[in-house]
C-alpha cells in the first residue's frame, strides 16, 4: 500500500489540543493518517514511497463546505440585483429544470475544481432533479469527498412544473440513488436525502424521505428559515416554522444539516441543540442578496452545531472558504458590536473541525490526527500578504489568506492537486466547455443576461 510523507511544514492539527507543530510532518498510508509530529521523528520512523516537501507552507485539514449546489455553478454572476425568491423563480429554478445531463456534469465539475483549488476537501451538496446522477459522476471524477443528494420538491405553489416530483415516485428514485451512490468512490461519497425546503415539499414527501433516512441511516440536508416570505407561508399552512415542522416529521438529528437558519426562533434553537441538528452558515450569499444575517454567534452559544459554507457560485459568485471566514467574522462582530462574537480561532474551527462535526464526520475528517482520513491542504506562506508569520499564523489564515494561496490538496490519501495543478479533471477542458455551454443554456431557457454597463461587442 502506498505511503505518503508530507514534511517540513507547520502543521495546524485542529486536534483537541489545537496543537500547531513547527517543522512538522504527516505520514499517510492508503487513505488514512498514520502519524503526526516533528519532521525528524516522523521521517525517522516512516520511510514512504512519496515525499512532499512542505517547507514554507502550512499543513491544514481540508476545509469542509457544509452547503453547496454544484450544478448551479454555470449561473455565476446572474441575477445580481434580485432578492432570493426572484432569483430562484426567474433564474435558478428554470435553469435547474432545463439542464441536459452534459450541462449538469460540466457545471458540477466546474464547481468541484473551484472547491478543490480553494482547499475544500469535503462538501455537502444538493444537486437538482433528473440529472443528479451526472452531478455525482462529476464529483467522483474530481476526487472530492462529498455528502451528496438530489434536491426535490413537489408543491406546485412553490416550484415550477419542471422541478415538481410525484412523492411516491421520488421516494423510489431516491432509494435507487442511495443504493447506487451511498458509499461510492471508495466511500468518498455518502448520500443524503435533500428536501429542498419545508415550504416546497408536501408532508407526504417529507415523511417518506424521513423514513428513507432512518432505514439507511443516512443524513438530511435542506434549507431552513432562509427567507421571510416562504417562512410565513409555511406558518400559515402548518402552524409551524421550518425547524419545528421538520422536527415534527422526524427530519432533525445529528445527521441533519439545515442551511442558513436566518430566522431561527428560541424554540427552534433549543430543538437544534437537543437533537444535534446542525446549521450550515453561508455568511456572504444571504447578506449579498439582502436576505438577512443569521445570528450564528447566538446559535453557537445556544449549543447548536455550526459549520461554514459557501452556498452556490450561482448566487454567491465564488466558492472561497477563506472569504467566508472573513465575512462571517466581520458581520457577526459588526452586527453584535462585539469584537469577540466569533474569535479568529473559532472561524478556523468553523471551516474545519466544526464543519466535520456539523456533518457528523468528525470521527474521520476535520483534523490531522492518526487514524483519520488523509484530507489535507498545503498553504504557501511565502507571500507578501502572509508575511511576517511568527506565531500569527492562525490570524493570517483567517484574515489574510486567499484561495489562490492553496498550493496542494490531498483527499483520501491521494494528491488531487499539486502546485496548483489539478491531477483529476482536465481543468482547461472543463472551463472551455463551461463557456461554450453557458450561452446556449441561457438562450434555450430564455434566461436574460443583463450587463451592468453598456456592453459593446
Name each model-derived stretch:
Residues 76-144, 170-186, 435-443:
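Alpha-helical scaffold segments that flank or form the walls of functional sites
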Residues 74-106, 150-168, 228-255, 275-278, ...:
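Active-site gating loops and adjacent loop-to-helix segments of metal-dependent hydrolytic enzymes
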Amino acid at each position: 500500500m502506498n505511503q505518503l510523507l508530507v514534511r517540513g511544514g507547520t502543521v495546524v492539527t485542529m486536534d483537541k489540543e489545537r496543537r500547531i507543530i513547527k517543522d512538522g510532518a504527516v505520514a499517510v498510508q492508503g487513505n488514512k493518517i498514520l502519524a503526526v509530529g516533528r519532521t525528524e521523528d516522523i521521517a525517522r520512523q516512516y520511510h514512504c514511497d512519496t515525499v512532499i516537501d512542505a517547507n514554507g507552507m502550512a499543513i491544514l485539514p481540508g476545509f469542509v463546505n457544509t452547503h453547496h449546489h454544484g450544478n448551479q455553478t454555470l449561473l455565476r454572476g446572474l441575477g445580481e440585483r434580485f432578492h432570493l425568491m426572484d432569483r430562484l423563480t426567474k433564474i435558478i429554478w428554470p435553469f435547474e429544470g432545463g439542464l441536459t445531463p452534459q450541462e449538469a456534469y460540466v457545471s458540477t465539475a466546474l464547481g468541484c475544481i473551484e472547491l478543490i483549488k480553494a482547499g475544500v476537501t469535503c462538501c455537502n451538496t444538493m444537486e437538482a432533479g433528473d440529472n443528479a446522477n451526472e452531478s455525482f459522476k462529476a464529483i467522483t471524477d474530481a476526487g472530492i469527498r462529498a455528502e451528496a443528494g438530489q434536491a426535490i420538491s413537489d408543491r406546485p405553489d412553490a416550484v415550477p412544473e419542471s422541478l415538481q416530483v410525484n412523492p411516491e415516485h421520488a421516494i423510489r428514485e431516491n432509494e435507487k440513488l442511495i443504493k447506487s451512490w451511498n458509499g461510492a468512490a471508495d466511500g468518498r461519497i455518502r448520500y443524503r436525502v435533500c428536501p429542498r425546503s419545508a415550504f416546497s415539499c408536501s408532508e407526504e414527501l417529507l415523511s417518506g424521505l424521513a423514513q428513507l433516512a432512518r432505514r439507511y441511516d443516512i443524513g438530511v440536508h435542506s434549507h431552513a428559515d432562509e427567507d421571510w416570505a416562504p417562512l410565513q407561508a409555511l406558518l400559515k399552512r402548518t402552524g409551524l416554522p421550518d425547524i419545528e415542522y421538520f422536527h415534527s416529521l422526524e427530519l432533525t438529528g445529528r445527521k441533519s444539516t439545515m442551511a442558513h437558519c436566518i430566522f431561527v426562533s428560541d424554540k427552534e434553537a433549543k430543538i437544534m441543540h437537543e437533537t444535534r441538528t446542525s446549521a450550515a452558515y453561508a455568511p456572504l450569499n444571504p447578506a449579498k442578496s439582502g436576505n438577512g444575517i443569521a445570528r450564528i454567534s447566538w446559535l453557537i452559544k445556544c449549543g447548536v452545531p455550526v459549520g461554514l459554507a459557501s452556498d452556490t457560485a450561482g448566487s454567491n459568485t465564488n466558492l472561497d472558504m477563506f472569504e467566508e471566514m472573513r465575512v462571517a467574522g466581520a458581520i457577526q462582530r459588526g452586527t453584535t458590536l462585539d469584537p469577540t462574537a466569533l474569535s479568529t480561532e473559532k472561524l478556523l474551527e468553523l471551516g474545519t473541525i466544526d464543519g466535520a462535526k456539523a456533518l457528523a464526520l468528525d470521527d474521520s475528517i476535520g483534523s490531522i490526527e492518526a487514524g483519520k482520513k488523509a484530507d489535507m491542504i498545503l498553504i504557501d506562506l511565502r507571500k507578501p500578504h502572509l508575511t511576517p508569520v511568527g506565531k500569527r499564523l492562525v490570524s493570517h489564515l483567517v484574515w489574510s489568506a486567499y484561495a489562490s494561496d492553496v498550493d496542494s490538496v490531498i483527499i483520501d490519501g491521494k494528491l488531487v492537486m499539486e502546485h496548483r495543478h489539478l491531477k483529476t479533471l482536465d481543468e482547461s477542458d472543463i472551463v472551455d466547455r463551461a463557456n461554450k455551454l453557458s450561452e446556449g443554456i441561457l438562450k434555450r431557457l430564455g434566461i436574460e443576461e443583463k450587463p451592468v454597463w453598456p456592453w459593446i461587442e
